[in-house]
Amino acid sequence: MLTGKTIVLGVTGGIAAYKSANLASMLIKLHADVHVIMTQNATKFITPMTFETLTNNKCIVDTFDRNFSFDVKHVSLAKRGDLFIVAPCTANVIGKLAHGICDDMLTTTMLATRAPKLIAPAMNTGMWENPILQDNLTKLKGYGYHIIDPIIGRLACGDTGTGKMNSEEVIVEHILSFMAKEHDLAGKHYLISAGPTQEAIDPVRYITNHSSGKMGYAIAKMARLRGAKVTLVSGPVNIKPFCGVDLVPVKSAADMFQAVTSRSAEADVVIMCSAVADYTPAVYADQKVKKHDGDLQIELKRTQDILGWLGEHKPANQTLVGFSMETENLIENSRAKLLKKHADLICANSIAGGNTGFAVDTNKVTLISSQEVKELPLCSKEETADLILSHIQTLA
C-alpha cells in the first residue's frame, strides 16, 4: 500500500522507543522507504543499528555527523519525505515543536518539511494532563499536526493511566489514511451497515446468522482510506473498525433500523451490507425458557425492511446500495430486489462456492444496476470493496 512512499520516523527518548522498531518493520512490510531520525536521548533506549538493520537506511542522530554523503540532511529529508511520524513523542519534543525550537536533527527537519506531520505522544499521566502540554498540543493542531492520542495503560512509573503510546497497528492505520490511497471520496459521507443482528428469544438465547461483518468493515476501511467521512452501523462482530470510522454498535434488527434511518438523510451514499434478520420472536421471554419433554414453538414476526424504507425515503442525489446473498437464481432475484427496493445498485453474492460469502477473506460479487450487470473477479474483500466503491462513483 505504501510502495514508492518515503516515511520519516522520528524516535524520541521514552521507554516506548522500543516499539518504534516494530513500527518501522510494519511500514517496511507495506513497502515504504523508511528513514529514521533519533534524538540523542532515544539512543539510550534503543540503538541506531536496530533501525539501520530494519530499514536499510542510515539512522541519523547527530546534525553535524560527517559520516555520510554530502547534502544538507535536514533539508534533504524534509523534501523527500512524503509523511513524518514521531513515535514516541515526548513532552519535551512536543514543547520544542510547538515553539519552533530547532536544537537537533529531528526538530530541525520537522520545521523544514511541508509534508503531513503526525505525532504519537507517550508520557506520564500527570505530564499528559498538564495544561502546558495540552496548550502545546493545541498549538501543534493549529499548525497542521495530527495527534494520535495515547491510551490508558500501565506506564513506566508503575501507574495505570492515560499516557501509553497508542499501538503500532493504530499508528499504521493513521499513516495509511493519509497516504495509501488517492482521496477521491473526500467531502463525501458514507453510511455503511455491517454484520449480523441478534434477535433475542430470552435473556440467554437469540436468533442470528453466519455474517462475520468482514465485507462491510472492508468497505468502511477502503472508503475511509479514500478520504470519505464514514459512519459504520454494525451488528455484533469481532472486528475493530479502521481508524477514523465512526462506529455505531447495534444488536437487533430494530436497533439497526433506528440507527440507519436516523442517519440516512445526511449521507451521500448508503451501503446496506449487513445481514439483517428477516424475522424476530413475536414475544420476548423475560426469564430463561426452560426445556421440557415436548417441542418448543416460537412465533416469529417480520422485522422492518430497512433497505425498502431507505428506497422510499431516498433524498435526491443520494446513492443507495444493497447486498443480496442467494443460493440460486442470483441475477434474477437480485434484479428483482433492485427494482422492489428502489436501490441504485445491488451487490449480489452467491454462497455456492467455498471461497465466497460468510466468514472467508475473499469474495466474488456481481454488480447489478438498471444499466448493466458487471461480474467482479474473485479477490480479497478489501479489493472487492475498492472495486465496489469505484463503481459507485460511476453512478453518481
PLM regions with names:
Residues 1-118, 124-213, 217-396:
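A cross-family phosphate/adenosyl-ligand binding-site feature
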